[in-house]
Amino acid sequence: MGNNCVGPSAAGQNGFFANVALWRPRPADAAPPALPPPSSAPSDQAPEPVTIPPSEHSSHHSSRSTDPSTPTSAAEQPANKAAPKVKRVQSAGLLADSVLKRDVNTARLKDLYTIGKKLGQGQFGTTYLCVEKATGREFACKSIAKRKLLTQEDVEDVRREIQIMHHLAGHANVVSIVGAYEDAVAVQLVMELCAGGELFDRIIQRGHYSEKAAAQLARVIVGVIEACHSLGVMHRDLKPENFLFIHQKEDSPLKAIDFGLSIFFKPGETFTDVVGSPYYVAPEVLMKHYGREVDVWSAGVIIYILLSGVPPFWDESEQGIFEQVLKGDLDFSSEPWPNISESAKDLVRKMLIRDPKKRLTAHEALCHPWVCVDGVAPDKPLDSAVLSRLKQFSAMNKLKKMALRVIAESLSEEEIAGLKEMFKMLDTDNSGHITLEELKTGLQRVGANLMDSEIDALMEAADIDNSGTIDYGEFIAATLHINKVEKEDKLFAAFSYFDKDGSGYITQDELQKACEEFGIGDTRIEDIIGDIDQDNDGRIDYNEFVEMMQKGNNAMGKMGQHSTGNFGLGEALKLR
């Protein structure tokens, strides 16, 4: 049994990450290093810093500290105030003439590439298929509209992500950046195309896997973390969705994507800004005093899910999840854990130690007997229940959001009394859309005392099509009182909207068309149906539809979790 324990220089053979989807404002005193020249292998030094004009907003963000003082206690910084995600403010104009901060090549993107179909729509950018004219090779092109870059921090975030992608260039499991282009209206990033799907989706499609296969995936994940840390990069948003396969073949490399929250760090440096995703965030992030150890925690959560199909810290609300992250016990007694090897449990336990000083480092985790090449992970197939749970965990019920929108648009003026005027009050520029800033201003006007992170969560829950704004239909759907939603005639009308052929069932084809109509892309239709379909006939009948609409009744957040209990936009605006 060989222990193929690699060091920083060799870690480049085991890793992954890239894509531009989400940015976190960066303080003025933390300017990112300059863009390094392209390289075929990872550099062992961070690029030299460049001078970037300070932002007028930076005084509101104290994101990093070099003072290793005692962390703020959980009592002083309640977990339920932590931001699971940070959204960029919608903007009307750019604060910098050039985002890339260099002389842009005279060649334009369209001179070199043919732009093809849309691959995905993110919060702040659209990804297209693009084909290199000279070679016919396919790539992914992410287009970021400059009008959405409102603050200097927004501009710096884009620059920093590009810098980090170049800094990690050459790593076998990090999505490669091919080039960055800029014109008068957008920044375009051309990247390696990952057409093989997400990590969990691949496992679900295959229908079976073993501890040994899980250990191989864990080795890739931890290997990327070690490579990032050795090059002075902290990812800060590790989760299964950020791991994609290049192609559908069995031997496809796994690539890490999305460095939108990543940041350069120095040894001993600590950070305070709360970033990440609820299930995967480390406890010290919620306590606002953390370092690179947070990435190991997130990887430990992913490995726990790979082995059991459920997250280690679970609750029906984000507040509850955060409380579990801070205080909850690890469950190794429920199924399937009695059948999982002791070595696997030992690794997960050591990666999920709450004290970051006692937690395994990425290098130590990579050297663990369960993870290392030819290690002790058994080849015995994992219980089929793990796959079933994994499928449930990965699926997100988007049908309910679409149905609420349909019901909202069918209501009479009397039924939505007051909501129309409320929308007009919030939509101060009469654009027909409520921006994040308008929502914040409106909530303050009605006396709602909410943190930015809570307003971000409300915005995300209401913004069905991920456009970054709330249109009238989305607003009504988000603020409706539940007694209107549960009326029989409204439910039947909504069901009939999706049941185009009047068969009495919503089929996969009908749901696919509905997703296209609502601008909801990158969706596994069979998973949405499977989450609702109780008799396993592959379609949704009226009774199943009604039960879905009446169950929970709180807005769904990312990864299928309920966002914040029964608290939603209606409550925030004091409409309920």
UniProtKB/Swiss-Prot annotation:
Which residues are named in the active-site annotation? Answer: 237
| Record-listed ATP binding positions | 119-127, 142
- Quick one: where's the N-myristoyl glycine lipidation? 2
PROSITE patterns linked to this entry:
EF_HAND_1 (PS00018), EF_HAND_2 (PS50222), PROTEIN_KINASE_ATP (PS00107), PROTEIN_KINASE_DOM (PS50011), PROTEIN_KINASE_ST (PS00108)
Kindly list the GO molecular function terms attached to this UniProt entry: ATP binding; calcium ion binding; calcium-dependent protein serine/threonine kinase activity; calcium/calmodulin-dependent protein kinase activity; calmodulin binding; protein serine kinase activity
Q: Where is the EF-hand domain?
A: 414-449, 450-485, 486-521, 522-555
Sites binding Ca(2+) 3 sit at 499, 501, 503, 505, 510
Low complexity compositional bias: what residue ranges?
41-56
Activity regulation field: Activated by calcium. Autophosphorylation may play an important role in the regulation of the kinase activity.
Q: List the disulfide bonds.
A: none
For whether the record's keyword set contains Kinase, the answer is yes
The cellular location(s) given in this protein's UniProt record come to:
Membrane
Its EC top class is transferase
Entry's InterPro entries? CDPK_Ser/Thr_kinases, EF-hand-dom_pair, EF_Hand_1_Ca_BS, EF_hand_dom, Kinase-like_dom_sf, Prot_kinase_dom, Protein_kinase_ATP_BS, Ser/Thr_kinase_AS
Q: How does it sit in the membrane?
A: Lipid-anchor
Q: Where is this region: Autoinhibitory domain?
A: 377-407
Coiled-coil stretches: none
Question: In its UniProt entry, what is this protein called?
Answer: Calcium-dependent protein kinase 11
Question: Which organism is the protein's source?
Answer: Oryza sativa subsp. japonica (Rice)
Gene (UniProt) = CPK11
